[in-house]
Amino acid sequence: MNLKTDLPIEVFKTDRRKTVCIKIVDGGVHVIVPKRLSDARVKDLILKRTSWIKQKLRIQSETVLPKPKEYVSGESFTYLGKNYKLKLIPNGDGEVKMKGKYLTLGYPKILSETDRQSFVKESLVGWYKGHALKRLTEKSNRYEKILRVTPRSISLKNYKSRWGSCSNSGEINFNWKIIIAPHHIVDYVVVHELCHMLEHNHSPKYWRHVQSVIPDYKMDRQWLKVNGMGLFV
């Protein structure tokens, strides 16, 4: 399709979509549209959203990526919105413990620096996932009663660009990294997915369900847009 634009746009037509979706991905733009939509209609939609697309591309280009973790003693790690200092202890087996303002982690002393970093990262990720499943299940149980829904299952995923999902059969998956965020953000994500059991879309009716439980949900959505890239271990 010849769009006659200097914007880095790729158009994808699929039978799986009923509406138009525009995504900013790695400095480019993916426009995903229903297969039945004419090229002329697609061009018109892109033209109308040109200002929005340029704004999003500019914001992405100005975004500073978080500094990669080094997995060394004294480094800060966040859990449920609070920062903890990592304290590495030689002659350990990878068990992670929360002690006051510290996350202590024992590692085998014989490991090389590279192997130690990998060992520490894997141990921390395992700890975060274990706590994520526990906390997300607890929060889901709480909000299920309020919304009067019963998920078929609660599981964790390692999503790259989403915080959760809800299948038509009621299977809910959460991105385990959401447990890094403050409590109120985790609550929003849990309610967001549970409300999809009432409305499997993002219609005004769906958002009314969300707002009935999380009145300030728009602030939580904005928080995730601004801070989501920093939620990693």
Predicted regions and their residues:
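Active-site-proximal or metal-binding-adjacent scaffold patches in catalytic folds
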Residues: 1-187, 197-233
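Walker B beta-strand of ABC/ABC-like P-loop ATPase nucleotide-binding domains
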Residues: 190
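Walker B catalytic acidic pair
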Residues: 193
